[in-house]
């Protein structure tokens, strides 16, 4: 019984870390083909178009996509519930970026997600504070 308790105590942090890592992983959708639109949808902070902080001005989502020597910085946006065109939702926790890869192979992505008053229009790439649940998230997908 004591050995089982020790094993549980040792495994708990690892399981929690895996759960946190999975929480930041985006849903990747679209045709994973050259020149086709690929969409990454992240679960991020819950926001409202009418609320404070404002999701369009006070947050900035940038995703850098790399493949070999190719590197693209793509801005993302607040997508409310992820289906606002059909639901008319003005609040939610979905954040989205679209990308059309110009080469086959493994594409890596790295997320910069920051929050501050007016950060979306700031020229400073380090403006605002990192949003811990998404900032620094990395991953890959294959084209």
Regions found by a protein language model. Name each.
Residues 1-6:
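Positively charged n-region of N-terminal signal peptides that target proteins for export
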Residues 7-17:
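Bacterial N-terminal signal peptides
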Residues 19-23:
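Boundary at the C-terminal end of the N-terminal hydrophobic targeting segment
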Residues 32-37:
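Solvent-exposed, conformationally flexible loop/turn segments
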Residues 40-52:
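Short amphipathic, basic-aromatic surface patches that mediate peripheral association
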Residues 52-60:
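Short coil-to-beta strand junction motifs in C2/discoidin
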Residues 78-143:
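Extended acidic/polar, glycine-enriched regions
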């Amino acid at each position: 019984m004591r050995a089982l308790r020790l094993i549980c105590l040792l495994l708990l942090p690892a399981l929690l870390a895996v759960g946190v890592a999975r929480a930041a992983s985006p849903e990747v959708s679209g045709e994973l083909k050259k020149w086709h639109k690929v969409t990454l949808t992240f679960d991020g902070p819950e926001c409202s178009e009418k609320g404070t902080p404002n999701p369009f001005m006070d947050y900035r989502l940038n995703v850098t996509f790399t493949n070999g020597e190719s590197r693209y910085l793509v801005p993302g946006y607040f997508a409310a519930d992820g289906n606002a065109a059909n639901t008319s939702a003005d609040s939610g926790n979905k954040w989205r970026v679209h990308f059309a890869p110009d080469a086959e192979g493994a594409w890596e992505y790295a997320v910069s997600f920051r929050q501050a008053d007016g950060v979306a229009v700031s020229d400073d790439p380090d403006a605002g504070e990192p949003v811990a649940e998404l900032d620094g998230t990395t991953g890959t997908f294959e084209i």
